[in-house]
């Protein structure tokens, strides 16, 4: 592998880096005599926070201008209507045809609202219905802690304790959970499970769970199925409607580049909202923004839910947050959609894998050794992961100054290579097809190997 090969691959796969604001050595506060202050960083951290699309600044300023020029009037009479801007009362509606194809849902099955965990809690209150022996929730061990807290408290609301949470662990000698282990667990616990709710992509290992197969298995036993798509949305193609998923939640500040704490979203299969009559609607955490829009401002004490996922909205959304995520969603459409991006992503992460596995420091997943090196925790099969590779450094040292991962990460940071560390020993590398290139992926691995060489020589 060489930088020349990387450049040839860059000629085959377009980059949209020019559409984004890229942090530089100067903006990151990094002084390195080898580089000009204006040199772009290599940003491999879109799995934690996506970069800012350049058009986001204009989109936000348009709404600040509307606020300053018309105040409350902009809810119904936006000053930018002539150039296609939306009045605030309907600000989120233009996003539905943009997000629906990214998650593989119909427009009436998606809503832009809330935050990831608040949405998960809202879905749990509507879809977690323990009854008789079927009271338990199944999810993976090492799920993102916020999910665990939500599941635990949902169980406690119904009077159950943590014994009603079933978690599948990675088997000894493995680095991720096998699909057959999940299927076996669902089958063995079919009489106890009220809900199955895994991560679409596991945040720590980067594993892309087989959503279709797992959902089909659980549904065959009459079990409700939800998914946390925080690391899947905008990363891999999804087919939530066709997979018959009951509900899903996601955030937008990672692969959808909406900005820190950006507005999130939900999917609710249309079968759950088709009978949203006043008499028959499914109980949920409700609010006025989920009510029939034509009657919303009549302030009636009648909940008449919209016949779509929009009925799960509670309050009017933050206008600034909505237009921020809309900017990025429009980029997805502009470049041909998630399926086109996935083609590049598979090759880009495959290139990253090839570079890492060709190193003398690479240790196979099944190998047991304490030598200096690293393992890839993520599945090596390209179809079983998104863009992220989770790299485990060893041997483990508790002391910060000796810790291999910390020393590698510091060296990368000093060279303006931005990635995500997960203590005690993991660095998550995520080359994104929107704004990362094969050339910078090559350079990033080159720097990583340099760091390992310096550690081996006791130079850092």
From Swiss-Prot:
The keyword Coiled coil does not apply. This is Kynureninase. Catalyzes the cleavage of L-kynurenine (L-Kyn) and L-3-hydroxykynurenine (L-3OHKyn) into anthranilic acid (AA) and 3-hydroxyanthranilic acid (3-OHAA), respectively. It catalyses: L-kynurenine + H2O = anthranilate + L-alanine + H(+); 3-hydroxy-L-kynurenine + H2O = 3-hydroxyanthranilate + L-alanine + H(+). The modification N6-(pyridoxal phosphate)lysine is found at residue 254. It holds the Pfam family KYNU_C. It is an enzyme of class 3 (hydrolase). Keywords: Cytoplasm, Hydrolase, Pyridine nucleotide biosynthesis, Pyridoxal phosphate. Pathway: Amino-acid degradation; L-kynurenine degradation; L-alanine and anthranilate from L-kynurenine: step 1/1; Cofactor biosynthesis; NAD(+) biosynthesis; quinolinate from L-kynurenine: step 2/3. GO terms for molecular function: kynureninase activity; pyridoxal phosphate binding. GO terms for biological process: 'de novo' NAD biosynthetic process from L-tryptophan; anthranilate metabolic process; L-kynurenine catabolic process; L-tryptophan catabolic process to kynurenine; quinolinate biosynthetic process. Belongs to the kynureninase family. NCBIfam families: kynureninase (TIGR01814). The gene is BNA5. InterPro entries: Kynureninase (IPR010111), PyrdxlP-dep_Trfase (IPR015424), PyrdxlP-dep_Trfase_major (IPR015421), PyrdxlP-dep_Trfase_small (IPR015422). Pyridoxal 5'-phosphate binds at residues 116-117, 144-147, 199, 228, 231, 253, 288, 316. It is found in: Cytoplasm. Its cofactor is pyridoxal 5'-phosphate. Its EC number is 3.7.1.3. It comes from Debaryomyces hansenii (strain ATCC 36239 / CBS 767 / BCRC 21394 / JCM 1990 / NBRC 0083 / IGC 2968) (Yeast). Homodimer. One of its GO terms (cellular component) is cytoplasm.
């Amino acid at each position: 592998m060489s930088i020349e090969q990387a450049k040839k691959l860059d000629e085959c796969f377009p980059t949209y880096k020019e559409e984004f604001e890229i942090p530089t050595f100067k903006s990151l506060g990094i002084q390195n005599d080898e580089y000009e202050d204006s040199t772009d960083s290599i940003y491999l951290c879109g799995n934690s926070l996506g970069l800012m699309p350049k058009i986001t600044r204009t989109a936000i300023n348009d709404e600040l201008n509307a606020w300053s020029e018309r105040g409350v009037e902009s809810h119904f009479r936006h000053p930018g209507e002539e150039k296609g801007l939306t009045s605030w009362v309907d600000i989120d509606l233009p996003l539905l045809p943009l997000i629906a194809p990214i998650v593989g849902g119909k427009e009436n099955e998606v809503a832009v609202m809330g935050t990831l965990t608040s949405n998960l809690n809202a879905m749990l209150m509507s879809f977690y219905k323990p009854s008789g022996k079927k009271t338990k929730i199944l999810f993976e061990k090492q799920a993102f802690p916020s999910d665990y807290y939500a599941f635990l408290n949902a169980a406690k609301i119904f009077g159950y304790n943590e014994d009603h949470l079933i978690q599948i662990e990675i088997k000894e000698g493995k680095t991720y959970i096998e699909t057959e282990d999940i299927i076996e667990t669902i089958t063995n616990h079919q009489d106890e499970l009220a809900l199955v709710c895994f991560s679409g992509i596991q945040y720590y290992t980067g594993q892309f769970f087989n959503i279709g197969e797992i959902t089909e298995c659980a549904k065959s036993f009459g079990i409700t199925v939800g998914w946390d798509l925080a690391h899947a949305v905008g990363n891999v193609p999804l087919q939530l409607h066709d997979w018959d998923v009951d509900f899903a939640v996601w955030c937008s500040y990672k692969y959808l580049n909406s900005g820190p704490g950006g507005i999130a979203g939900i999917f609710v299969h249309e079968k759950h909202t088709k009978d949203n009559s006043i008499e028959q609607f499914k109980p949920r955490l409700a609010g006025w923004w989920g009510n029939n829009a034509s009657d919303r401002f009549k302030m009636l004490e009648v909940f008449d839910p919209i016949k779509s996922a929009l009925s799960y909205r509670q309050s009017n959304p933050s206008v600034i947050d909505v237009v921020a995520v809309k900017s990025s969603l429009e980029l997805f459409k502009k470049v041909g959609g998630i399926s086109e991006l996935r083609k590049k992503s598979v090759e880009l992460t495959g290139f990253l894998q090839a570079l890492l596995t060709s190193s003398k420091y690479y240790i196979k997943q099944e190998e047991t050794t304490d030598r200096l090196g690293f393992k890839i925790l993520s599945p090596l099969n390209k179809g079983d992961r998104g863009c992220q590779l989770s790299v485990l450094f060893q041997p483990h040292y508790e002391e910060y100054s000796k810790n291999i991962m910390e020393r590698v990460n510091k060296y990368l940071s000093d060279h303006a290579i931005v990635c995500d560390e997960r203590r005690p020993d993991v660095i998550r590398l995520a080359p994104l097809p929107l704004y990362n290139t094969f050339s910078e992926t090559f350079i990033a691995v080159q720097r990583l190997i340099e760091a390992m060489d310096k550690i081996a020589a006791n130079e850092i």
